[in-house]
């Protein structure tokens, strides 16, 4: 019997959603359904058709459709949520909470109605709280609802380190813990260039500057763009997670996972090292933290909890 083609639905056809859809199709991970609200159905269909017409040129075989009808998403293996209002200059992530929570709850009801077996990956900001809202609304096990921020934050950290050392980014590894915000915790002790600890290659003050730039990475792009926020790197980070799930790769990657006692926290979604595979979240990896790292993580958790207080 022939293998059934995989199906990924991307909710939200803005810059991030559309880029996620295109990269997913380009890598031939699955057929893609791009979804947006009825008022934007034609532009969504137009983007999907434009991507599809790129397939003969790029040489990929994946069907891409645009729609506002959730029935078209039925039977999805993975659903990615990028829908929501965007952050504007000067706007804190917390300002987004109430509006985006309503969007998350409404979208989630449609997802579980048509794809009850799907694994859901959330990107919408503030992502720790929005992933929690999706989890609560969905009724799915925690393994099937995960958020994306750590891959993006780690990618930014790796980029800045590679620039500092004038090395290939391929040789730089790192890990970022905590919430997706100014209190994220880049774990410098677990960061390497070609297997060599960063602390032996870069002076402390330069590492501190890189950590600070990583924390402000999203805001830096928001300010440069003047209108809108980052989308290429967030989309690429999402697709790395989608690939790990669809191919059951069991990749070690930082994701936003629901904690039930891990790291000493309970009932909260937080960025931690995890193993991602065919079941979604396969395992949470607990690292030994120094006192300073622990206190930074506590601060990060408090920030996430403060955002979660706004949730209904």
Swiss-Prot record:
**Could you tell me the keywords of this UniProt record?**
NAD, Oxidoreductase, Phosphoprotein, Tricarboxylic acid cycle
Q: Where is the active site?
A: 180
E.C. no: 1.1.1.37
Q: Identify the residues that bind NAD(+).
A: 12-17, 36, 100, 123-125
Per the UniProt entry, the disulfide pairs are none
Reaction(s) catalyzed by this protein?
A: (S)-malate + NAD(+) = oxaloacetate + NADH + H(+)
User: Example GO biological process term?
Assistant: lactate metabolic process
GO terms, molecular function: L-lactate dehydrogenase activity; L-malate dehydrogenase (NAD+) activity
Provide the leader sequence positions.
none
Binding of substrate, residues = 87, 93, 125, 156
Function recorded in the entry: Catalyzes the reversible oxidation of malate to oxaloacetate.
Q: Which family does it belong to?
A: Belongs to the LDH/MDH superfamily. MDH type 3 family.
| Designated name of the protein | Malate dehydrogenase
The major lineage groups are: Bacteria, Bacillati, Bacillota, Bacilli, Bacillales
